[in-house]
Amino acid sequence: PCRSRGLGDVYKRQGEIQVTYFAAGEKVGAFDSFDEVASGNSQAYIGADYYWKGKHPGWAPFTAIPFGLTAGEIDAWVKYAGGQELWDELAGSFGLKNFAMGNTGVQMGGWFNKEINSAEDLQGLKMRIPGLGGDVLAKLGGSPISVPGGQIYENLVSGAIDATEWVGPYNDYFMKFYEAAKYYYYPGMH
């Protein structure tokens, strides 16, 4: 997320853990934090695992499952039904250890520069949507585009993308998407 500084060097001093945070782009690019930590150059990142599904498709379900488990159900699966063990196995194969750090809950469908009335309206739509939600959009004829959070607004304004999902009204307000796109839809595909 753009307001949470996602990459940190952690070190121990006098029995305390101190963390130095770097926002996306300060040390590495927004989509480079996984490799930065997996390589040992940094000790932790905060991010959504669906961004790493290109490295292994197993990452995506730990963030969102379109029209599947709710955020609370994913949390319960991770904590009580074997999800953490699967996550540990997957992350371990990359030299990582993952922890649930919270979630944003049910998300909106997103901001669109054109009206959507049917699935046909998604044909050719360039939308910033990661993870399995992007796979759903592609199956419906749209084009999922990867754009870091801090670049979404400018991409909407320039027309590089036609639509974006982010989080929900509160978070989206601070991103000022209402200035860049006319239509706001619910529910989300992720």
Residue ranges with predicted function:
Residues 49, 168-169:
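Short secondary-structure boundary segments
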Residues 1-7, 11:
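Single conserved hydrophobic/aromatic residue that forms the stacking wall/gate
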Residues 35, 43, 48-144, 149, ...:
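Contiguous mixed-secondary-structure segments that line small-molecule binding/active-site clefts
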Residues 158:
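Short terminal or interdomain "cap/linker" segment that borders an active site or interface and mediates
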Residues 12-16:
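Short helix-capping segments at alpha-helix termini
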Residues 18-43, 71:
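Extracytoplasmic small-molecule ligand-binding "clamshell" domains
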